[in-house]
Amino acid sequence: MLKVIYRERIFIDTYQCIEYEKEFKAWSCWQSGGLYYFKVDRFNHKVLAVEDTISIKEV
């Protein structure tokens, strides 16, 4: 099981945004073309850009 911490941005307008750090657990991950793909359960995947991913740790 992996613990993933990532940065989520909510844009208020063209020049301002609010950044949050969020986390989730995933079964596995792989990287392809600047994106991380995380298997979060039997049927679903979550896709994050490499630059938005803060840490991936084995739990």
Regions found by a protein language model. Give the residues of each.
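Boundary regions of SH3-family modules and the immediately adjacent low-complexity/disordered segments
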Residues: 52-59
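Generic structural signal for short, solvent-exposed loop/turn connectors between secondary structure elements
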Residues: 1-2, 59
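A short beta-strand micro-motif
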Residues: 2-10
